[in-house]
Amino acid sequence: MKRIAFRSTALAAALLGCSALSMPSATAQEPVEITFFIWAGSNQGVVPMEVIEAYQKENPHVTINILESNNTITYPKMVAARRTTPDDPLVHCGFFNVDSITKGDVDDMWESIDPELVPNIETVFDQYRRPDDRGVGYQMLGIGLIYNKDQVSEPPTSWSDLWSEGYRGRVTMFDYDTRMMVVASRLNGGDERNMDPGFEVWSENAENLKALVDSNDALKNLLVSGDAWIAPWFSPISYIWIKEGAPLGFAVPEEGAIAFPIFLTIAKGVDDAERKVCSDLVNTLLSTENASRYGQLTYSIPVVNGATATEEQMSNPALNLEIAESAIVPDYNFIAEMTPEWRQRWDREVKFKLR
């Protein structure tokens, strides 16, 4: 986890040009300091960091700290901070995946975004607007199977490969990956509301798990080294690793990829000045130019009307909206409610067997 404090630099103008520097200025001139969350690696920080540098050039009284990590590590710390210092959030605003944003609904973590402060929210596709605008959709990713091409001669074809005999001791994934619990249940006669089949499958095949990780780098290192051969993973990040020269491939299972939207949101506990800064940043990130550039750099799919993709993205079904047409869409809101119970079951029925 990395914190970076950005202050004004002349570089911002060179990076962004006139259009990016025309973003709104915070009205208050008293010093304002916030923390903005971004994901680490795979170009995910490029656009928000550029936007933040430009904003601070226009608003020298504002200090924006960057917290760079992942939601798995950071979100529980945000919840803990809200319990102890509700008026002083650990993170004021930033990027959150669908797992964290739905958990935040249960934990009452999010402010409603004010459309008057964030007019670009009206350009987001309706299906990616949230109840009471407690966060807003930004990009969509697909989850499929990433694998080591040196170790796997034929690309995997099904989610069930993760618990098949051919991958004993060769599977890695994030710990407590509720999507993998759900897909195992769905493929074995259950669903989100009947999870017994899924837990039974993973319990019976716990020996397939080489390691459960909590960072992108850990998962990548296991796959590249050949210690693990296969993992459920995001199509855009997989594609970036492949372009970097990693000996990896990516496959969309025959049952479909898993839809995984990402969001921008503002945390509860912000004061008026902090809310204004966060709203300005969210609004600027939602511009068609920034949404397009973020999607192009990260190979994700913008959900902002008018955003554009590269020819490379348009021609690759794993990187454009085609992947969403046949995607598995878990009931993320129900998953958020059940996550505490499911984590306990995972510990008892699956992780216990890894000791």
Enumerate the predicted regions with their spans.
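Periplasmic-binding protein-like
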Residues: 127, 140-141, 183, 200-205, ...
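Extracytoplasmic ligand-binding site segments that recognize negatively charged/polar headgroups
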Residues: 39-46, 72, 88-224
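A ligand-binding cleft/hinge motif common to bilobed small-molecule-binding domains
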Residues: 101-103, 224, 229-247
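A bilobed periplasmic-binding-protein/Venus flytrap-type ligand-binding module shared by bacterial periplasmic
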Residues: 144-151, 185-188, 261-274, 293-294
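Mature extracytoplasmic/periplasmic domains
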Residues: 267-329
